[in-house]
Regions:
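Loop/turn elements at helix/coil->beta-strand transitions in domains of secreted/extracellular proteins
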Residues: 36-37, 70-72, 120-125, 181-185, ...
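Catalytic cores of secreted or luminal carbohydrate-active enzymes
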Residues: 249-328
């Protein structure tokens, strides 16, 4: 942030760097790049690696893994950590993109970073802090959750019933150590676990975004997110309970894009699976998030990076005409 645009471009071209710290005992960091850093968070559809989950592959993953060698894309996965106490450090290490590293890395994040790197021709760093099945509440602080009385925070670690759903535990364990890290923005893929609490999601997600921005003290940084893809949630609904229409959750997600500045939503209505909550088309998710970043954050012109948004309907005799905004 202290360098001019021309100075940054010069730094990017003269890569990689070696950085030496010396307080009497030298510490050398080698193979350092200067580029764009994005935080990638959410639940299993953000966490899902390029190699896929058991019996749940990622579309075209084999060929994309084989072609993934690119020292200008750097990958960091935050180790799963669930706790009621805010942490100051995380476990993990930076790795260059290669078949051996990409196969275990978030598919959505990788496809996002690959396109951003390709179009901008600058190094891209990706930090993934995600946990499958995690609730929105888990990525928030106790103060932010005061407005949501249904979010119950345990008194002690032994009272934690769910390591990935309990309010505050993933914010404390996986996000708090990253606060203050200079980054360009966030991509987010979450909402499936909140599908049956859609009535609070728009307010809660808005609170999360504003809270993260307040903690980071880097202004209204870009925050782009995926709308949940189609899936038959009756499969995971308890016997005897009513199946809740997930259109309510998607509507809540759509509201956030219009109430919170510098956000954008990637629609995935054409990229889901009726019987699979982890759709294989992760390239669609990652690249739609990248299109948002490229057009809204980096100013790339000539393409429409935003997903179509419902505008209204008109009924003429026996015909219903549906109109959309941003349908280019």
């Amino acid at each position: 942030h202290l360098l001019s645009r021309r100075q940054r471009q010069m730094c990017i071209r003269d890569r990689p760097y070696t950085v030496t710290f010396d307080d009497g005992t030298p510490k050398v960091l080698s193979n350092i790049l200067i580029g764009e850093l994005w935080l990638c968070s959410g639940q299993s559809n953000m966490e899902m690696p390029m190699k896929g989950f058991k019996n749940q592959p990622v579309e075209n993953a084999n060929m994309d893994i084989l072609r993934s060698r690119n020292p200008e894309i750097r990958l960091f996965t935050v180790k799963r950590t669930s706790t009621l106490t805010p942490q100051n450090d995380v476990t993990g290490s930076w790795k260059e993109a290669s078949p051996a590293t990409v196969r275990d890395f978030s598919a959505t994040a990788y496809y996002f970073g690959r396109l951003v790197n390709e179009i901008l021709d600058v190094p891209v760093g990706l930090i993934v802090a995600a946990w499958g099945g995690s609730a929105c509440e888990a990525w928030m602080t106790a103060d932010w959750l005061k407005a949501f009385p249904d979010a119950k925070i345990p008194r002690s670690e032994t009272d934690i019933k769910s390591k990935n759903r309990t309010p505050t535990v993933l914010y404390n364990g996986m996000l708090h150590p990253l606060i203050g890290l200079t980054m360009k923005g966030v991509i987010w893929y979450q909402g499936e676990d909140n599908w049956n609490r859609a009535h609070t999601y728009a307010d809660m997600f808005t609170t999360l975004i504003n809270g993260w921005r307040t903690e980071w003290k880097q202004g209204d940084f870009p925050f782009y997110y995926c709308q949940i893809a189609p899936y038959d949630y009756g499969i995971i609904t308890e016997r005897g309970k009513e199946v809740i229409n997930t259109a309510y959750l998607r509507e809540a997600q759509a509201q956030v894009e219009h109430r919170v500045p510098n956000t954008g939503m990637a629609v995935l209505l054409d990229a889901g699976m009726e019987k699979g909550i982890h759709p294989p088309r992760k390239q669609v998710a990652g690249e739609r998030l990248a299109l948002l970043a490229l057009t809204k954050t980096y100013g790339i012109e000539g393409v429409n990076g935003e997903s179509p948004y419902y505008k209204g309907i008109e009924i003429k005799n026996d015909t219903v005409i549906v109109s959309f905004e941003r349908a280019g």
